[in-house]
Amino acid sequence: MPDAVKVGFVPFSTASRGTLVVFCDETLKFGRAAGKALGSSAGLVKRAAAANQFKGKSATTLDILAPEGLKADRLIVVGVGKTPALKSSDFLKLGGVIAGKVRSDNNGVTIIAELPSATMEPDLSASLASGIRLRAYKFDRYKTRKKEGDDAVNRADVSIAVADVAAAKKAFAPVNHVVNGVIIARDLVNEPPNVLYPEEFARRASRLRAMGVGIDVLDVKAMTKLGMGALLGVGQGSARPSRTVVMRWNGGKKGEPPVAFVGKGVCFDTGGISIKPANGMEEMKGDMGGAACVVGLMHALAARKAKVNAIGAIGIVENMPDGSAQRPGDIVTSMSGQTIEIINTDAEGRLVLADVLWYVARKFKPKVMIDLATLTGAIMVALGTEHAGLFSNNDELSERLTRAGLDTGERVWRMPLAPEYDKLIDSKFADMKNTGGRHGGSITAAQFLQRFVDDTPWAHLDIAGTAMGAPKSDINQSWGSGFGVRLLDRLVAEHYETKR
């Protein structure tokens, strides 16, 4: 998708035309540059605030015609609340709030990025710019008739006025690459399934070659030779052949074990022979949200030249019913040699992940391995749409993911793993079965995956409630959210990049 908005940094002295945006705290105090820009109009603005009961609380806005004397036509005052408590994630949200207010403004927007009572560091300006871009995103490439104003955001030119332009640009550069990764993930999730099928998904992931990412695409013949019977069983009812794509970024020390990310990529999930209800089935185009995140993350790591060795692996299939489709009662042999009784063909994502997890663990011996999957409806019953489910065999990794989630706003909540749950997936006829019954469904799904990771420090993120169809937020108005890219990039940056 073309970029929805142009964002740049300019000095405080830049003239403000079109819309002027300034910040104030709960005392309605403005920063020095904003006060200078407002001049004698500051008193009028405060009277307008009183008339509109605007109190400067965080993320609230006062939107008025610019008072006489300002070069701007429109003035938006954005509350920041109590400034000492502000964090980077707060400015991400504020950027989204501003983008939501100026979508229809094609006369230019200038934001004076200055706090009333504190210095606004370059990283906060970078977060502000990121929030603007994330909120401005929309997916409308298949609309041939557009309502008046639909394209206004494409003409929005946002200038962020800062004290140090060079420092702001430097801070924004790596963050902007991460935003691009989120947008890539959103685009993939939003694509219709007749356009984004396994072969096409593999082609799009392969575009990362141009950024220095090593790419291996395993076709059906290669996966058959490897013994990936669990993954191949899922796709055998589809006319679209399955693929596994392995992406390698070598930005760390030579020979250092990589961090690995594995994504579920079911491009469309009918449920197979255990077919889903027709109502809402169209949303199963997003059942590849985990794989989309991994591709977006690998883009971000490569684009910002992350000092880490990283593996991204995605298993890409369609789960369709036909005469050759997998049946309930079938027994398949996974790459690990473990056998699996198929109880429900709609519990297919764990079968895909089982083979890819085993392949990555054995071939690359990663220091940590994290998988992402829109795996279970049960996690939505447990956690709703505000947290992803986190399952892990490693406390340190779990704590790091939780912290990264709090820092980025992509929050996770740890769920239990225990032998009592694991025994629920034992089978009378095979080593295990692919469902463990009605209760604790997200837990038994994670227990299934754990059988394919050996002793690798591992975490599973069930993103069924956060990757697609989640409630709209200040930084996302799209059906596909791109959840996980910012979370995992933060994890890598904080804990796994080489310090040079």
Swiss-Prot record:
It comes from the Bacteria. CDD domains: Peptidase_M17 (cd00433). It catalyses: Release of an N-terminal amino acid, Xaa-|-Yaa-, in which Xaa is preferably Leu, but may be other amino acids including Pro although not Arg or Lys, and Yaa may be Pro. Amino acid amides and methyl esters are also readily hydrolyzed, but rates on arylamides are exceedingly low; Release of an N-terminal amino acid, preferentially leucine, but not glutamic or aspartic acids. Its main location: cytoplasm. The keyword Manganese applies. Binds 2 manganese ions per subunit. GO terms for molecular function: manganese ion binding; metalloaminopeptidase activity. InterPro entries: Leucine_aapep/pepB (IPR011356), Macro_dom-like (IPR043472), Peptidase_M17_C (IPR000819), Peptidase_M17_leu_NH2_pept (IPR023042), Peptidase_M17_N (IPR008283). It is an enzyme of class 3 (hydrolase). Mn(2+) 1 binds at D269, D346, E348. One of its GO terms (biological process) is proteolysis. One of its GO terms (cellular component) is cytoplasm. The active site is at K276, R350. It is found in: Cytoplasm. Coiled coil: none annotated. Keywords: Aminopeptidase, Cytoplasm, Hydrolase, Manganese, Metal-binding, Protease. Its EC number is 3.4.11.1, 3.4.11.10. PANTHER family: CYTOSOL AMINOPEPTIDASE (PTHR11963:SF23), LEUCINE AMINOPEPTIDASE-RELATED (PTHR11963). Presumably involved in the processing and regular turnover of intracellular proteins. Catalyzes the removal of unsubstituted N-terminal amino acids from various peptides. Belongs to the peptidase M17 family. This is Probable cytosol aminopeptidase. It comes from Nitrobacter winogradskyi (strain ATCC 25391 / DSM 10237 / CIP 104748 / NCIMB 11846 / Nb-255).
